[in-house]
Amino acid sequence: MPRPSSPRMARGVARLSAAALETWQETWMDIGFALPNLLDSDEMRLFAQTVESLGFESVWAADHIILPIEKTDQYPYTEDGSFTRPSTAPFLETLTMLSFLAACTERVRIGSTVVIVPYRNPVLQAKMFASVDVLSKGRVVCGVGVGWLEKEFQTLDVPYADRGPMTDEWLTIFKDLWTAEFPEHHGKFYQYDGVQFYPKPIQKPHIPIWVGGHTRRAIRRVVNYGDAWHPTRQTPEWMESKLPYLRDFAHEVGRDPDEITLSLKRTLHFTDTGLEESDRIRSTGSMIGTTQEVIDDIKRCRDIGITQLTYDFRTPDVHDCIRTMEHLAEKVVPAI
């Protein structure tokens, strides 16, 4: 199979784009892909531009500043709590990555999946997201989470026990700075007044906030602050089981639950394409199966009301990732 960077493959991708876009519009399902741990800027550009040329909807970047040498048992999405990446896994800084992705692409949305909100100063973080939104002409998604890795909090001198309330306050600050002419905030963890914040984001009323997490606290955060619920490492059936609580809480606080986009992030690997699966630990909720099983799974997601899927991969090789995306576009999209 020719590499995606070849002229032949580039022409094939271009021919597929219009059909793929039209098909996804008809099925009301947006699909995006999270960048693997890449360090080569040419490979990152190739990945992002392939997502765009295949007609998919978004490119996403994860967030870790450091990883501990010692094995952790805190990761929520494996049976024994161990993380699925080694301590040497390269994570480029998330907002920097989003700026790079904005420059590489023209149409796709670019988002964080998810930025750990308490790790960064809230005013500077709001400025960084607003800047990327301006530079990308309004394509940024602010995917947020509270974090889970205590060692990372300790290293950054951020109180682990306060990560939930800090996240809530930071999100309040984001919206204030992005929308108010004269922003002012007097909270438990942060205060400011007598300032202005420009430029505002291009997207109105503000950059969309997609809230990650799988707990009831996370679901309440979605309803209180979010435009979408973006859990990770879960199955469609699990997500469906949590929707009654989301709807009930939304009605309780006077919000229409239908305003909230439902998104799900999972690992994708086809078992019938000849691509080898890496030997790293599997996370829960992975979609690892045949082409038909993936088709059935996406239909199931659509029936539940999920309208956006974000996939990552069981391989760090950019060309294998691209082959997976091509197979999804060529074999799965038409079947939906």
Residue ranges and their predicted role:
Residues 7, 14, 18-336:
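Active-site-adjacent structural elements that line small-molecule/cofactor binding pockets in enzymes
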